[in-house]
Structures are given as C-alpha cells and as structure tokens.
Amino acid sequence: MTQKEAINELKSEDSIHPRRLLELSKRIHGNSAKKQIAVDMLERYTGHDIKKFQKQIILTNFHFYVEQFNEAFDDSYHTKGSAFQASSSKKAKVTIVEFGVGSAMAALIGELISVVHPKAVLFLGLCGAVHRSLKVGDFILPIAAIRAEGVSNHFLPAQVPALPTFKVQKFVSQILVEHNYDYRTGTIHSTDFRFWEFDHRFKDNLIDERVLAVEMECAALFTTCFVSKVNIGALLLVSDCPMQKDGIKTKKSASEVFRKYTSLHIELGIQAMQEIATRGEKIRHYTW
C-alpha cells in the first residue's frame, strides 16, 4: 500500500486517526516530499553528495574529530557545507559528520541522515560527569537518556524513553573490552540548559535522577533516529566534572581534553563502525 492509499484509507475511517495521519506526514521514510527536501538539505548543509555517504556514520560536535578522521584515511572525501562538514572514506566504509551543538541540531541531523539508510550511526559526544566516581577521560556507554531537551517531544509522547540501539552499543562495548578500556553504563540527562552548572535546583534534580552525566544531544538523537528507523548508539567522553569545585570546563581544560583523549575517542568509534561494516550480521530495527 502506498502512502497516499494509506492516508486515504485513514481518512475514510472515523475521527480517532488524526494523530496517525500526522505521523504519516511527518516521518521521512513515509513522506516522499519530505524525503526529497531532506536529501537536498543534507547535501546543502554538508556539501556532500548523497552518493558519497557510507552506510556507517559517525556524528560529532567538533571539527577536531573530522580532522583526525581525515588524517587516518588517505582516501577521505572532505566537504564543508552551509552548516556542517563531512568526510567519507570508501576504504573504511565510514562517513563522519560534524553537525554542531545542541538538541535542535541533533534532531535535525537525526532526521536528515535517515535518507542515507545507514546500517549504523554512532554519536561521539562529550559530557559532564554527575556521579562522583567519574573523572575526565572516562568513557560512558549510555543505556538511556532523560528527555529534558524539549525537541524530542515533537516526535514521540513524553512518556516514551529515549534509548540507543542495543546492538550498536554492543559492538562498541566489544571494541572497548578488546582494548582493555573501562567504561560505565547508565542513564544520562539531556538538557537544553547550557549554564545549568550555576543552578543549584537543577543540580539537586540530577542527583535525584541518579544519572551518570549531563549532555545536550543524546535524547534528541535517540528519539529522532528511532522514529526515522535509524540504528544509533553513543560513546560519550567525560570532558569535565561540573558537580565538583572548580570542575567546570574552561578554555584551558578543554584543550587538554582534546589533546589527551579525543584521538582515542575517534579511533574507537571508527573501529566500532568498521566492525559493523565488515560483519554480515544484520542490525534489526523495531517496526510498528
């Protein structure tokens, strides 16, 4: 049944289906007009031809990661568009996209990347530690994200959890274990509140939630990718410890993080995506 036929069938039934009609119109995989605009936007924002995108995609907030990717592969095809930048390696079968910072941009790239029909997507993000046991340089594999960033409410009801794709997280965890790197798993808090470090009520709420860390993109990425039928995981790097005295990231400490830890972060992400590319194992997405 085509999308048009499905919509006409719903229109002919009773009035309990307007939400279903809205869902059909919103989702890229069920809306050819939206998909055409999304392809155009993805190419325009990244400067990347849609045919150059590989089926394994890494998402990042920072241009340093793209630079590291370009240095790793001599066949990298690197472009800068009007908003993002991207680089692809046919040899590695991986594309990396820098999409900016925040939940709105995360939701946008989550939808746009669905037109590539990737096998797997991995977000390499930075986060601020909440739990006292975490320190700068630690890795977190989130099992869920608290949806406090707002934009995900446009895609799913508030009671639906924001979850990564288990199998993507499994591949990443295997890479970490094989290289003898420790990591933590747990829930993270995704917020749109940038200077939360100075709000004591916000910080008290984080303790009540029992979250490991705070960041800005995971909930939006997990939600939009789920709705868009994209398999996504995340590997987060602790970049500061804002709950501790003098623990907030500064220009100086941020440069230290990039110098010491991000090369390993991108290396692990690339290896995980290459592992997914070379294995014939299919990553199934829940359908409804």
Residue ranges and their predicted role:
Residues 1-122, 128-288:
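Accessory terminal and edge-of-domain segments that mediate assembly/interaction
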